[in-house]
C-alpha cells in the first residue's frame, strides 16, 4: 500500500505531523520509517506539497526518504518517471574535465541516489528502469528547454547550483510533477563570488505556503530506520 492509502490521506490534505510518526514507506526490498520530528515533517511535506526543500547535514535521511517517496509514487502510478539531478560541479571539478561518456561522467555524482534505489528496488530492476528511461539521469545543462510532466524530480547537493541553475530546475516542473530539492548550506563548493542557488531560493521563497522547507540538524543523523520488506527477505 502507498502511504496515502495506509493513512487514508490525499495529496494536498493537511494533517498533523503526529499522523506520520509511525508510518513506513513500503518499497519492494525495504520498509523505511521516519524517526524524529524533522524526518516526520519532511515526509508529510513531500506527500502534501509539490515542491519541498530538505536542508541540513549528510546522514540525516534527506536523500533516502526522498527516494523512498519517489519509488512509492512510481510504483503506485502517481508519476510516470523519476528524474534524478545533481550538480556536477564539486570541489572544482566540471563534467568536461572528467573521462568517459555522459552517463559515466554523471553517475559518480549520483551515487547516493543510486545506492538508495538499489536498496529499495534491487540493481537489476533499477537498471531496467534506467534503460527504459523510466528513471532518468538529467544533467543540469541538458534540462534547458524541457518541461517535465508527471515526474518525481529529486535534486541532491543543490547547494552547488547557481541562482540561474536553480531557477532553470524549478521552471522545468510541469503538470503532475513533484520536486524534492536537497542540500547542505555548509558544504558549498562554488567559487566564493557566486551565490548558491539553494541559499538564494530559500531566502526568496521560504514563506510561500505552497512550498515545504524542512531544516535538519545533527540530532537527525542516523535516525532513519529500515527493515526488510516481507516481499524481500533475502537480506
For each of these PLM feature ranges, what is it?
Residues 1-18:
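Interdomain "pre-motor" coupling segment immediately N-terminal to P-loop NTPase/helicase cores
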Residues 64-129, 193-207:
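Conserved P-loop
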Residues 135-152, 162-166:
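Conserved RecA-like ASCE ATPase "motif II neighborhood" in helicase/translocase motors
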Residues 61:
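Conserved glycine(s) of the Walker
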Residues 225-230:
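Conserved small/polar residues in nucleotide/adenosyl-binding loops
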Residues 54:
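Hydrophobic anchor at the beta1->P-loop junction of P-loop NTPases
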Residues 37-45:
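Pre-Walker A adenine-sensing motif
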Residues 88, 93-99, 161, 165-199:
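Conserved P-loop NTPase nucleotide-binding/switch module
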Amino acid at each position: 500500500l502507498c502511504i496515502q492509502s495506509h493513512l487514508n490521506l490525499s495529496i494536498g490534505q493537511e494533517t498533523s505531523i503526529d499522523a506520520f510518526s509511525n508510518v513506513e514507506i513500503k518499497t519492494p526490498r525495504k520498509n523505511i520509517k521516519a524517526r524524529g520530528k524533522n524526518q516526520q515533517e519532511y515526509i508529510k511535506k513531500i506527500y502534501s506539497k509539490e515542491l519541498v526543500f530538505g536542508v541540513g547535514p549528510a546522514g540525516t535521511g534527506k536523500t533516502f526518504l526522498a527516494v523512498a517517496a519517489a519509488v512509492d509514487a512510481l510504483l503506485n502510478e502517481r508519476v510516470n518517471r523519476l528524474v534524478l539531478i545533481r550538480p556536477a560541479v564539486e570541489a572544482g571539478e566540471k563534467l568536461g574535465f572528467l573521462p568517459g561518456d555522459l552517463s559515466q561522467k554523471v553517475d559518480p555524482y549520483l551515487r547516493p541516489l543510486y545506492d538508495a534505489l538499489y536498496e529499495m528496488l534491487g540493481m537489476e530492476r533499477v537498471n531496467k528502469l534506467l534503460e527504459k528511461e523510466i528513471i532518468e539521469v538529467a544533467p543540469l545543462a541538458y534540462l534547458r528547454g524541457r518541461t517535465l510532466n508527471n515526474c518525481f524530480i529529486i535534486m541532491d547537493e543543490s547547494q552547488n547550483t547557481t541562482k540561474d541553475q536553480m531557477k532553470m530546475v524549478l521552471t522545468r516542473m510541469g503538470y503532475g510533477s513533484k520536486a524534492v530539492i536537497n542540500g547542505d548550506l555548509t558544504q558549498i563548493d562554488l567559487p566564493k563570488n557566486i551565490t548558491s542557488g539553494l541559499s538564494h531560493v530559500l531566502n526568496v521563497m521560504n514563506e510561500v505556503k505552497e512550498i515545504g522547507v524542512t531544516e535538519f540538524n545533527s540530532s537527525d543523523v542516523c535516525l532513519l530506520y529500515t527493515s526488510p520488506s516481507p516481499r524481500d527477505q533475502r537480506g
